[in-house]
Every structure is written in C-alpha cells, then in structure tokens.
C-alpha cells in the first residue's frame, strides 16, 4: 500500500510515542475521516490490477527470454510475480477489515525531516518512512502534521 513496513510493530511504536507525548491523539472532522477511509480503501484496491499487470508483463518478458535465449532467469523474479498479486489481494482484504473494525487512528505529530524519496520522518516514529496519502504535499522540519495509522501503515493527511 502506501506506508513503509518496518521490523518493529507499528502499533507498539505509536503507543510508545503517544505515552512519551511526542504524538498527540487527534480528533479529526467526520469529513476528513471519511476521506481517509475512502482513500485507504481505494489505494489498496488499486494495487490489485497493478500487481497483475506487473506480473503479466514480467512473466511475458521472462517467457520470451527463456524461449528465445534459452535463459533460465526465472526463480526470484517469477516468484515475485506470483507473490505480488497475492499480497495485493491480501492487503485489500486486510484494509477493508481494518476499516470495518475501526482499526485506524489519527495523531498530531511533528515532522523531523524529509528523505530523498519524498517520505517523511515523524518525531517518535523516526524509523518509519511516512508518505503523504492526500492533502498538503510539502512539510518542513518542525511542522505539525496529522499522522493516520491503519493496520501497520502510517500516512500523512491534511484538510487542504
């Protein structure tokens, strides 16, 4: 989906950051919450056709390589092609389950910095690279931002 997955448990880290009061639980407008839920659902569903297209393209290229060059460059890449669509479907199901079970929450956090690939680090959640799901695209260090957590994904959202 959108955010980056890291080794340690996202919920645990969010709780720790909240306990240390570097993350403050946020109450957001009904409207913004609905927008978040819609966006989270659609971006997880969007991954499904993309994953099949990627898999089909890569498998076609592999097939042509094997057919014409008798190259057996299959292993890892083919495995990825099989796993990616399965993961995408799993992710979409997990996301809609999370929405149904209200497994999402919002916080006010402070931007620490932005890294090269456009993701942000938030105070207390430094090891996570957090991307913007919608709203404001550019943040500066020290800015306050709304951090949304759904399942183990973290995203930045804003009204504007």
Regions found by a protein language model. Give the residues of each.
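A membrane-cytosol interface segment of integral membrane proteins
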Residues: 139-160
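Cytosolic juxtamembrane N-terminal segments of multi-pass membrane proteins
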Residues: 2-45
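Beta-strand/loop nucleic-acid-binding surfaces
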Residues: 127-139
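Short aromatic-glycine-enriched beta-strand elements
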Residues: 116-123
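Alpha-helical transmembrane spans
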Residues: 35-101
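Secondary-structure transition/turn motif
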Residues: 124-128, 159-160
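Structural detector for short beta-strands of small beta-barrel domains
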Residues: 99-116, 146
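Short, flexible coil/linker elements and helix-boundary hinge sites characteristic
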Residues: 69-70, 135-136, 155
């Amino acid at each position: 989906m959108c955010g980056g997955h890291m080794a340690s448990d996202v919920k645990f880290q969010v709780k720790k950051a909240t306990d240390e009061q570097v993350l403050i639980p946020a109450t957001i407008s009904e409207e913004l919450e609905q927008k978040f839920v819609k966006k989270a659902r659609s971006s997880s569903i969007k991954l499904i056709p993309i994953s099949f297209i990627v898999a089909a393209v890569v498998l076609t290229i592999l097939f042509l390589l094997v057919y014409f060059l008798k190259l057996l460059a299959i292993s890892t890449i083919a495995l990825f092609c099989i796993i990616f669509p399965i993961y995408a479907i799993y992710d979409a199901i997990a996301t809609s389950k999370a929405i149904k079970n209200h497994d999402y929450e919002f916080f006010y956090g402070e931007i620490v910095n932005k890294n090269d690939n456009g993701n942000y680090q938030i105070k207390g959640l430094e090891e996570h690279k957090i991307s913007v799901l919608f709203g404001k695209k550019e943040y500066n260090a020290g800015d306050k931002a709304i951090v949304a957590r759904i399942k183990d994904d973290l995203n930045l959202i804003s009204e504007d």
